[in-house]
Regions:
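A cross-kingdom marker for long, charged
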Residues: 201-236
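Mid-length scaffold segments of soluble, non-membrane domains
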Residues: 93-163
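Bacterial signal peptide processing site
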Residues: 18-21
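Sec-dependent signal peptide recognition
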Residues: 2-8
């Protein structure tokens, strides 16, 4: 009798172990997709890095700003009257050159300052990475912009000033402003174009990073690393 009880108990134990093993075997499949906030943050940073590498790099080429309507730097409102005034007195070529050199300065500055943007991405901390991951198509870029704009401006503005001198924008715009201010009866202007161009160039950088972020979010083929594939699969 005891042997029968032992045999039944053994069979029950073995059966229970088998069922338990089946449950255990199923657990990795259920939990392997769970990522920590740090993992997701790393994926978001990688997406931003790709934005700099693949999209912002396009801005550093000749006409990278000028020929891209998404980021082309146009004159601020206060200088549109300057542009019109020059064209009215037959100086359209000079007016065109003024717009072109603003974009040339931005192209040169972004080329020089790319490491600044890379460092900004490295230094970013996502307090709630999952919320950003599940946010809008440009949520990570917006987070970068909101968190780093002031610091980036401080570092980028001197680069713009150097680029202004390098591409001749200082000289051309001194000539433009002088000629405009000499037109009878016009209100004199004295714009700070390095400040304006700094802000516009930074907007262009964020715009292009956002282009790549959207690609990664919406196109599986743009997720070129295992980390990107794993992280962004969560928001599909």
């Amino acid at each position: 009798m005891i042997r029968k009880i032992l045999a039944i108990t053994t069979i029950f134990f073995i059966s229970s172990c088998a069922e338990l093993q089946q449950v255990v075997d199923s657990l990795p499949q259920q939990t392997e997709g769970i990522l920590s906030n740090a993992d997701i943050g790393s994926g978001l940073r990688q997406a931003l890095d790709l934005g700099i590498e693949k999209q912002v790099s396009k801005l550093t080429q000749k006409d990278g700003f000028l020929s891209n309507e998404l980021v082309k730097i146009v004159l601020p409102e206060e200088l549109k009257k300057v542009d019109k005034g020059l064209r009215d007195i037959g100086l359209s070529k000079l007016a065109d050159e003024g717009i072109k050199v603003l974009n040339r300065a931005a192209e040169d500055a972004v080329s020089t300052a790319t490491p600044i943007f890379v460092d900004a991405v490295k230094g970013i901390t996502f307090n709630d990475a999952k919320t950003i991951l599940l946010g809008n198509d440009n949520a990570a870029t917006t987070y970068l912009q909101n968190g780093k704009s002031s610091a980036l401006y401080t570092k980028f503005n001197p680069v713009i000033k150097n680029s202004f001198a390098k591409v001749g924008a200082d000289e051309i715009w001194t000539n433009i402003i002088t000629k405009y201010n000499n037109i009878p009866f016009v209100k004199k202007v004295n714009p700070d174009l390095t400040d304006y161009t700094t802000n516009e160039a930074l907007k262009g950088v964020y715009t292009m990073i956002a282009v790549e972020e959207k690609e990664i979010r919406t196109k599986v083929g743009s997720r070129t690393t295992a980390l990107l594939q794993k992280v962004f699969a969560m928001q599909d």
